[in-house]
Amino acid sequence: MKKKYKKVVVGGTFDRLHLGHKALLRKAFEVGEIVYIGLTSDEMIKEKQYSERILPYEKRLLDLIKFLEVNKYRNYRIMKIHNAIGFTTKIKSLEAIVVSEETYKGAVLVNKAREELGLRPLDIVVIPIIRSRLGCKISSSLIRAGLIDPFGNPIRREEK
């Protein structure tokens, strides 16, 4: 089946790989022949909520590779990123960026940076936010806080 784009990019921390991350990655592979994955460096995540609980880069990288292998995704490149723009201005042949509704603003920033360098802006492919069984978005922050699991199920706390 012919893909819509030759080269697409997707980025994130991909901490405690959850249903939202998986939906984002699946969409990237659905629309792109080659998927460039920007994985945030440990330095970049220091300002995130519960940053002390974010898994180290190497562990997140291994978890990401495991997901890609289990799903038999082959045409990808994982690159460490140190800021929101990452390598998107260095690979001129990128055609699209895959984001969630929540991270759409990041795609706009990427396109602004590309346009400032005279590069073609990327088409923006947006997936909806994946909701937990509690009705809130599934996020690594909620998983790190111990409120939900990676599938969006609430974690029952022992009553004291």
From Swiss-Prot:
Record has Heme as a keyword: no
Taxonomic superkingdom: Archaea
Localisation: Cytoplasm
Any Gene Ontology CC annotation: cytoplasm
Main EC class the enzyme belongs to: transferase
GO biological process annotation, one example: coenzyme A biosynthetic process
Cystine crosslinks: none
Pathway: Cofactor biosynthesis; coenzyme A biosynthesis
Enzyme Commission number(s): 2.7.7.3
SUPFAM superfamilies reported for this sequence: Nucleotidylyl transferase
GO molecular function: ATP binding; dephospho-CoA kinase activity; pantetheine-phosphate adenylyltransferase activity
Catalytic activity: (R)-4'-phosphopantetheine + ATP + H(+) = 3'-dephospho-CoA + diphosphate
Keyword presence, Nucleotidyltransferase: yes
Sorted UniProt keywords: ATP-binding, Coenzyme A biosynthesis, Cytoplasm, Nucleotide-binding, Nucleotidyltransferase, Transferase
InterPro entries linked to this entry: CoaD_Thcocales (IPR054937), Cyt_trans-like (IPR004821), PPAT_arch (IPR023540), Rossmann-like_a/b/a_fold (IPR014729)
Purpose of the protein: Reversibly transfers an adenylyl group from ATP to 4'-phosphopantetheine, yielding dephospho-CoA (dPCoA) and pyrophosphate.
NCBIfam families with a match to the protein in the record: CoaD_Thcocales, cyt_tran_rel, PRK00777.1
Protein name: Phosphopantetheine adenylyltransferase
Gene: coaD
